[in-house]
Swiss-Prot record:
Keywords, sorted A to Z: DNA-binding, Isopeptide bond, Metal-binding, Nucleus, Repeat, Transcription, Transcription regulation, Ubl conjugation, Zinc, Zinc-finger
Molecular function terms from GO: DNA-binding transcription factor activity, RNA polymerase II-specific; identical protein binding; RNA polymerase II cis-regulatory region sequence-specific DNA binding; zinc ion binding
Keyword Transcription regulation (UniProt): yes
Protein name: Zinc finger and BTB domain-containing protein 9
Upper taxonomic lineage: Eukaryota, Metazoa, Chordata, Craniata, Vertebrata
Gene that produces this protein: ZBTB9
Chain intervals for the UniProt region annotation (Disordered): 177-279, 293-376
Primary location group: nucleus
Domain BTB: 48-112
Places the protein is found: Nucleus
Cross-link Glycyl lysine isopeptide (Lys-Gly) (interchain with G-Cter in SUMO2), where in sequence: 286, 293, 307, 382
Keyword Zinc-finger: yes
Length: 473
């Protein structure tokens, strides 16, 4: 009697199974709270895995945070994972500590006269977003009349921060009081502050620059104002300066007071009735794609015989006639016309070579960093500029110029401790440490570079052929 074979189980139809239920949990402030915890650990010295030596000072940090914020640290730690890093002597300790605070917290408060030093360090660390925003801040401050040079005994402060509401950068400066750090969820980005002044004192201006994100295709060239050429009569070269001009008329924008929430422990400042001719000013700039441009407005000659060039940058959507001028001494020589072009030496790649400068024998130290200009592109097509005055036709050459001017050697060999300025130099050098030498199985010749070994192996026909045709081993 045959035993019936059991039938295989029939799989359930997929239509019968209910769809799996999923839930999603999201914490919008998770990234900021995580960075705050990392910053607190850094300040307490917990879980730090790298020591940074800057001009004799030792700062503790986390390798993962440094590598994520700076391409310089990313490549340096990738090539040599050492517990202690010594930064070049050109990096100032105070400026680097400020940028380290910016990396961990997303905000930085500093005196305005220290802004060029922070720009210099950010260029060396290849933090191009910070360099771009510092250049924008310098340009906006000069355009609005609030330069770096302090007037009288007033101390100017700047607050550089990243805001989650606008996704950009903002800066506030006030000659009378330190700005209040505000939260994007509790106050309006366009809020204003009223400085306190005694009887007979001038009412200080509160400057607020807010960056608004904008898509690339929505750029509007009509909003950019062309900067006018000016000649500076100051004898000191290589400096950026400016003062707050007194306005002579009412501000064209209607100003409305916005209530603000102050942190605990701080009292609200006394609000004085502002004269109609001196209201606080608010300037807005738009964040554009990082394509630095440059516009040479003219050159002039000082009475002492030293020729200086003034680089003028357009002011954007601001009011006033202020400009940002970089004075570049070119040494004694024939003078050129007021705004006419002059012949300048160029290198093998067609880039301008500015004589003189801020080297060891120069009068000052040149400021290097990418600049972004408005207006029409130059006729020669070199629209990527550096703060030192050089211009380049392509962006990689400009970035390479900034790296080489600092004499930094960030790329080090982990085997022989040799250091190189450029990454491809290290790549070529690492071929010498490829391990065992490549030996030809036919003639026994040995090669260091694998590509040379492959070419020889295709040509080699044995020991006799190699002896007859090769005069060296």
């Amino acid at each position: 009697m045959e035993t019936p074979t059991p039938l295989p189980p029939v799989p359930a139809s997929p239509t019968c199974n209910p769809a799996p239920r999923t839930i999603q949990i999201e914490f919008p402030q998770h990234s900021s709270s995580l960075l705050e915890s990392l910053n607190r650990h850094r300040l307490e010295g917990k879980f730090c895995d790298v020591s940074l030596l800057v001009q004799g000072r030792e700062l503790r940090a986390h390798k993962a945070v440094l590598a994520a914020a700076s391409p310089y640290f990313h490549d340096k730690l990738l090539l040599g994972d050492a517990p202690r890093l010594t930064l070049p002597s050109v990096i100032e300790a105070d400026a680097f500590e400020g940028l380290l605070q910016l990396i961990y917290s997303g905000r930085l408060r500093l005196p305005l006269d220290a802004l060029p030093a922070h720009l210099l360090v950010a260029s060396g660390l290849q933090m191009w977003q910070v360099v771009d925003q510092c250049s924008e801040i310098l340009r906006e401050l000069e355009t609005s009349g609030g330069g770096i040079s302090a007037r009288g005994g007033n101390s100017y402060h700047a607050l550089l921060s990243t805001t989650s509401s606008t996704g950009g950068w903002c800066i506030r400066s006030s000659p009378f009081q330190t700005p209040v750090q505000s939260s994007a969820s509790t106050e309006s980005p366009a809020s204003t502050e009223s400085p306190v002044g005694g009887e007979g004192s001038e009412l200080g201006e509160v400057l607020q620059i807010q960056v608004e994100e904008e898509e690339e295709e929505e750029e509007d060239d009509d909003d950019e104002d062309q900067g006018s050429a000016t000649l500076s009569q100051t004898p000191q070269p290589q400096r950026v300066s400016g003062v707050f001009p007194r306005p002579h008329g009412p501000h064209p924008l209607p100003m409305t007071a916005t209530p603000r929430k102050l942190p605990e422990g701080e009292s609200a400042p006394l609000e004085l009735p502002a004269p109609p001719a001196l209201p606080p000013k608010i300037f807005y700039i738009k964040q554009e794609p990082f394509e630095p441009k440059e516009e040479i407005s003219g050159s002039g000659t000082q009475p002492g015989g030293a020729k200086e060039e003034t680089k003028v940058f357009s002011g954007g959507d601001t009011e006033g006639n202020g400009e940002l001028g970089f004075l570049l001494p070119s040494g004694p020589g024939p003078t050129s016309g007021g705004g006419g072009p002059s012949w300048k030496p160029v290198d093998l790649h067609g880039n301008e070579i500015l004589s003189g400068g801020g080297g060891p024998g120069g009068a000052g130290q040149a400021v290097h960093g990418p600049v972004k200009l408005g207006g029409t592109p130059p006729a020669d097509g070199k629209r990527f500029g550096c703060l030192c005055g050089k211009r380049f036709a392509v962006k990689p050459k400009r970035d390479r110029h900034i790296m080489l001017t600092f004499s930094l050697r960030p790329f080090g060999c982990g085997i022989c401790n040799k250091r190189f300025k450029l990454k491809h130099h290290l790549t070529e050098h690492m071929k010498t440490h490829a391990g065992a030498l490549h030996a030809c199985p036919h003639c026994g010749r040995r090669f260091r570079v694998h590509a040379c070994f492959l070419r020889h192996r295709d040509l080699c026909k044995g020991q006799g052929w190699a002896t007859a045709h090769w005069t060296y081993k």
